[in-house]
């Protein structure tokens, strides 16, 4: 993994580590929402929701555009797919490691018998 892809993974997983951000992402993946409409859904200030949206945007999980005075957010499906791809790769690595541990344990058991 290059430094750039590691930084990207860090940003993605940091953004997804928060429950509110995951919920915001779920909403904007379903359709475009204004930031003010999103803010009403949460028991926090408008500014706090803006900050959550900014983290998601920085990670590339959503995009914003202006429509008059409103900022509209839309989820970026390709970024979510890249997260799934990263998790699949990590799963493959760990399954390989576990398989090697199983072989070592079986080998140890054979030597003890």
Predicted regions and their residues:
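Pre-recognition alpha-helix immediately N-terminal to the DNA-recognition helix
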Residues: 11, 22-24
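Short, Lys/Arg-rich nucleic-acid/phosphate-binding segment
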Residues: 66-72
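Histidine-centered divalent metal-coordination motifs
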Residues: 21, 52
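C-terminal regulatory/oligomerization modules of transcriptional regulators
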Residues: 1-8, 27-41, 46, 55-58, ...
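Short helix-coil-helix linker/hinge
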Residues: 15-20, 80
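Conserved catalytic core of two-component histidine kinases
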Residues: 75
């Amino acid at each position: 993994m290059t430094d750039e892809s590691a930084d990207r993974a860090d940003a993605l997983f940091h953004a997804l580590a928060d429950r509110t951000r995951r919920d915001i992402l779920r909403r904007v993946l379903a359709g475009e929402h204004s930031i003010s409409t999103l803010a009403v859904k949460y028991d926090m200030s408008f500014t706090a929701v803006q900050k959550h949206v900014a983290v998601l945007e920085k990670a590339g999980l959503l995009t914003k555009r202006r429509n008059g005075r409103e900022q509209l957010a839309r989820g970026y499906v390709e970024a979510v797919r890249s997260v799934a791809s990263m998790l699949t790769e990590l799963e493959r690595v760990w399954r390989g490691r576990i398989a090697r541990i199983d072989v070592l344990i079986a080998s140890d058991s054979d030597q003890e018998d």
